A protein has these predicted regions:
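Short, surface-exposed, charged/polar-biased interaction segments
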Residues: 38, 42, 54-57, 92, ...
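Exposed, interaction-prone assembly regions rather than primary DNA-binding/catalytic cores
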Residues: 110-163
């Protein structure tokens, strides 16, 4: 049987990126989209006063470290369907939702979308004035802590089975 990546697969990431570009109404670099994508799910890692929409799991920072291929595939999928545009300049490459992308995203509905949009708005409010460089530096200085609350989980499992 073929194993399929259900969580954080290309389609899910593409929808999340479209949600980010549609909600924030601004063109963003790949780096910023990657950062927003992570914090849209785990906002409490950026601001402990906020609630994350996904549960805290061990080693969740690995989803940030290992997502580059999936992000690029998701952007390629969105570009190929004219749901986003790419703005190229000498300084950067930025992506923005097209009218078609905005219309498609508007057709989606449900409680998860509401939570995701709320989380994206909060993340954008917290991060919009920060540079990509600042956010990258913040991530690399903090990511060791994200998921470390489960550091001794395996020790507890061993104790539970010793008798």
């Amino acid at each position: 049987m073929e194993r399929r990546k259900v969580l954080n697969g290309t389609f899910e990431v593409a929808l999340r990126l479209l949600a980010i570009m549609t909600t924030c109404k601004s063109a963003m670099t790949v780096e910023r989209l990657t950062i927003y994508s992570y914090f849209a799910l785990y906002l409490s890692d950026y601001n402990q006063e906020e609630n994350s929409i996904h549960p805290e799991i061990p080693y969740r920072n690995s989803s940030l470290i290992n997502c580059n291929d999936t992000i690029m595939q998701a952007l390629e999928m969105l570009l190929s369907r004219n749901l986003i545009d790419c703005d190229m300049s000498v300084a950067s490459l930025k992506f923005r939702a097209t009218e078609t992308g905005i219309a498609l995203y508007g057709q989606l509905d449900g409680p998860y979308k509401e939570k995701l949009v709320c989380s994206i708005k909060k993340a954008h409010t917290l991060m919009k004035s920060k540079s990509d460089r600042y956010l990258n530096n913040y991530i690399y200085s903090q990511m060791g802590q994200w998921g470390s609350e489960f550091e001794y989980e395996s020790v507890l499992k061993e104790i539970a089975y010793e008798e």
